[in-house]
Amino acid sequence: MKIGTRWIERLMPPVVTGAVVMAIGLNLAPIAVKSVSASAFDSWMAVMTVLCIGLVAVFTRGMIQRLLILVGLIVACLLYGVMTNVLGLGKAVDFTLVSHAAWFGLPHFSTPAFNGQAMMLIAPVAVILVAENLGHLKAVAGMTGRNMDPYMGRAFVGDGLATMLSGSVGGSGVTTYAENIGVMAVTKVYSTLVFVAAAVIAMLLGFSPKFGALIHTIPAPVIGGASIVVFGLIAVAGARIWVQNRVDLSQNGNLIMVAVTLVLGAGDFALTLGGFTLGGIGTATFGAILLNALLSRRLVDVPPPEVVHQEP
């Protein structure tokens, strides 16, 4: 935090952060689409889920509207249950695992093991996560209209501490989740206290195998339909950054950088170096930074030409 965040601002101005945020949403899009492409019934159920969420978002008010993702999922699950368990149109929902799961159980913990080669392979990912975290903060700033720059250092430190804590008990590295940004965009709830409460509740539910089994019963087409909405909103958040910062996409440098970044992210372009593979979000992030540095140019104010009045 002592070295500040100005260097990040220079590397990732609004035109870059907007492109990265949009690339994140486009990179996640195939995951949602593939999860609902197993059959025609799954695809139509995904459409029904999108409609349920959309109807809740537009035609409800108050608390129901703020919980539109949850309410939309519940309505879509009920429709899925009627169509499958009652009408037999698709794969029925099976609650056997829920009935056999225990109410309380401890997760599996393991002590960390240090491997130099593995550490060298995973260390560069931290740089990607810094850029991705910055993009997430910019997206939140664009949605809320608040300057989040003073909190960047805290966000990076918190991200690092969370990863260290997770690794100390055998967990994987953690980062901020772009899906939550989409939920914020839909619900218009930006309070940090809400996310603290959600984190505590999530940790407590992690000790309940029955809840985990219940989550597994949510049909894949319903999850996929909700993901289409959420991932799309992430992409829109990137465009919102451009609009609010008045990014000039008529400049060829900006245009080329944005075009390449979006294709790298949407196409999940990967680069492999030895045993390390940089995925689509990483290549899009680094591509945006490098292209912006190479193609951007400072606009110099050119004084208007002097008008010379000639004597008749």
Regions found by a protein language model. Give the residues of each.
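Membrane-embedded alpha-helical modules
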Residues: 1-86, 197, 204-305
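Juxtamembrane loop-transmembrane helix junctions in multi-pass integral membrane proteins
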Residues: 4-7, 112, 186
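Membrane-interfacial loop-to-helix junctions in multi-pass transporters
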Residues: 14, 43-44, 111-119, 148-155, ...
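Hydrophobic, membrane-embedded alpha-helices of multi-pass small-molecule transporters
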Residues: 42-50, 67-68, 106-136
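Juxtamembrane interface elements at the cytosolic ends of transmembrane helices
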Residues: 51-59, 67, 87, 94-99, ...
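Alpha-helical transmembrane segments of integral membrane proteins, especially early/N-terminal helices
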Residues: 76-97, 188
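Intrinsically disordered, low-complexity non-transmembrane regions of multi-pass membrane transporters
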Residues: 89-108, 142-145, 155, 294-312
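Membrane-embedded helical hairpins/re-entrant loop segments and their flanking transmembrane helices
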Residues: 121-192, 307-311
